[in-house]
Amino acid sequence: MPSFDIVSEIDTVELRNAVDNANRELSTRFDFRNVNASFELVEENVKVSAEGDFQLKQMRDILRGHLAKRNVDANAMDAQNPEVTGKNWHQNILFRQGIDTPTAKKLVKLIKDAKLKVQASIQGDKVRVTGKKRDDLQATIAAIREAELGQPFQFNNFRD
C-alpha cells in the first residue's frame, strides 16, 4: 500500500547560515551603526539583542528575509515576548520542530473530513498516511498544503 509521512522539521544548517548572514547584514547597515545589536543561535533558538524595541522589530524582519533566502519556512518561528534589561532589549525566537499531539489530531481530523480513502495514524512526532491509490495520497497532500495550521509541513518517505 502506498504511504507517506507528514513531518515538521527545519534544516539546522540552513538556520545557522541564515543567522550568520543576518549578523553580517547588521554589521553593514547604516541604521545599526554604533548600536549594540546581534543574533545568537543557541541550539534551535535564536536570541535577538538590541538597544530598542523598534530595532528588535527590524531585526526580526531581517531574520525572516534571510530565512526565506535559505528556504527555511518562517512559520516555524515562535517569537517570545521581548524582555528589557537596563537599556538592552532581548527576545528569544523558538523554532518548532516535530508535530505536537494537538496539531497531529487536527491533521488527522482534516484528512478524515476530506472524505478521501486514506488512513492517518499518529506516530510520535509525525503522521503516517496510507491509502490504496497514489492519487488519493496526492489529493491528501494538496488538502494539507491548503489548510493553514500555523506550522510548516514536509512530506517524506513516499512509498508505492
Swiss-Prot record:
Domain of life: Bacteria
Record's keyword annotation contains Protease: no
Any one GO CC term of the record: cytosol
A GO term for molecular function: nucleotide binding
CDD domains: YajQ_like
Keyword terms, alphabetized: Nucleotide-binding
InterPro entries linked: DUF520, UPF0234-like_C, UPF0234_N, YajQ-like_sf
Function: Nucleotide-binding protein.
Family note: Belongs to the YajQ family.
Protein name in UniProt: Nucleotide-binding protein VP1617
